[in-house]
Amino acid sequence: MPRRREVPKREILPDPKYHNIELAKFVNVLMTRGKKSVAEQIIYGALNHLEKKTGKDPVEVFTQALSNIRPVVEVKSRRVGGANYQVPVEVRSIRRSALAMRWLRDAARKRSEKSMDLRLASELLEASENRGAAIKKREEVHRMAESNKAFSHFRF
């Protein structure tokens, strides 16, 4: 571990339209090459599509989708006596959100719809209903942790 002082967490301001901090974080996750306005347009477009499709509050659908994607446990490699073991560990809350946002972004990028806002909207809708590629990724991580439960005594 570094011996320098601990780096403070930067405060992220809520997004300008919906005043939601998680949306602002997701804008930063989606942003490429510093083009924040493009990322905001994609997200707001996706939320508009969601509102038209479902008739529900789009921010509510977004938070429901994220909470469905968040992993509880994951595996970490631990070397013991010349062998590598996949040790299941609980995921900290900040990392849970970060992983969920990354998985959501990657799943939306892999979809076949025409524009990114349509891809993101349909992935958000599926994730809020507990299906889709991002949910599949979470289930895969949970399955890995479950199958390696025998090595959970190798704590970090």
From Swiss-Prot:
GO terms for molecular function: rRNA binding; structural constituent of ribosome; tRNA binding. Transmembrane segments: none annotated. GO terms for cellular component: small ribosomal subunit. One of its GO terms (biological process) is translation. Keywords: Ribonucleoprotein, Ribosomal protein, RNA-binding, rRNA-binding, tRNA-binding. CDD domains: uS7_Bacteria (cd14869). InterPro entries: Ribosomal_uS7 (IPR000235), Ribosomal_uS7_bac/org-type (IPR005717), Ribosomal_uS7_CS (IPR020606), Ribosomal_uS7_dom (IPR023798), Ribosomal_uS7_dom_sf (IPR036823). The keyword Ribonucleoprotein applies. One of the primary rRNA binding proteins, it binds directly to 16S rRNA where it nucleates assembly of the head domain of the 30S subunit. Is located at the subunit interface close to the decoding center, probably blocks exit of the E-site tRNA. Part of the 30S ribosomal subunit. Contacts proteins S9 and S11. Belongs to the universal ribosomal protein uS7 family. PANTHER family: RIBOSOMAL PROTEIN S7. This is Small ribosomal subunit protein uS7. It comes from Nitrosomonas europaea (strain ATCC 19718 / CIP 103999 / KCTC 2705 / NBRC 14298). The lineage of its organism: Bacteria, Pseudomonadati, Pseudomonadota, Betaproteobacteria, Nitrosomonadales.
